[in-house]
Regions:
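N-terminal Rossmann-like NAD(P) cofactor-binding module of classical short-chain dehydrogenase/reductase
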Residues: 18-20, 62
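Catalytic helix-loop patch of NAD(P)-dependent Rossmann-fold dehydrogenases
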Residues: 33-48, 55, 59-60, 69, ...
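Helix N-cap/beta-alpha junction loops of NAD(P)-dependent oxidoreductase domains
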Residues: 4, 27-29, 72-73
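A generic secondary-structure signal
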Residues: 9-13, 52, 104
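Short, glycine/acidic-enriched loop or turn micro-motifs at the edges of active sites
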Residues: 2-3, 24, 120
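Conserved NAD(P)H cofactor-binding loop of Rossmann-fold oxidoreductase domains
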Residues: 23-26, 65-66
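Conserved Rossmann-fold cofactor-binding substructure of NAD(P)-dependent oxidoreductases
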Residues: 1-18
Length: 130
């Protein structure tokens, strides 16, 4: 995603109805150790993708965000879409920033987006509610 020229070539050579965006670095601990790697890869890569999509007229995107965008100190799972966001690590920050960027694209560039906020895929919450 960080190679805008390659993205442009791919989008010009093939016809797509939309993009399912799962690409990102995703280790919370690593993001705390090397936040700039996460900012560059996740945020700048997404900006490249959205810019190329906009330039070729592709406006549909499904974005894989994360439950790490929620304020875990104020909210108790299960979360709802209206719960407060407040990230606790650089990984979550990159996901929330990308959500805001997508919101801007929807408002100002006629994009259509779906954002999925996943929870821990490893196992159930100790409360038994998830």
């Amino acid at each position: 995603m960080r190679d805008a020229d390659l993205l442009k070539k791919i989008f010009e050579e093939h016809e797509f109805l939309g993009v399912i965006h799962f690409a990102a670095k995703k280790a919370v601990g690593e993001s705390c150790h090397d936040p700039f790697l996460y900012y560059e890869n996740n945020i700048m890569g997404t900006i490249n993708l959205l810019e190329v999509m906009n330039n070729v007229g592709l406006k549909n995107i499904l974005f894989s965000s994360s439950a790490t965008v929620y304020d875990a100190e104020k909210n108790i799972p299960p979360f709802t879409e209206t719960d407060r966001t407040n990230t606790m690590n650089p990984y979550g920050t990159t996901k929330l920033v990308m959500e805001y960027i997508l919101k801007d694209m929807v408002m100002h560039k006629q994009f259509r987006s779906v954002v999925l906020r996943y929870f821990n895929p490893i196992g159930a919450h100790s409360s038994g509610l998830l």
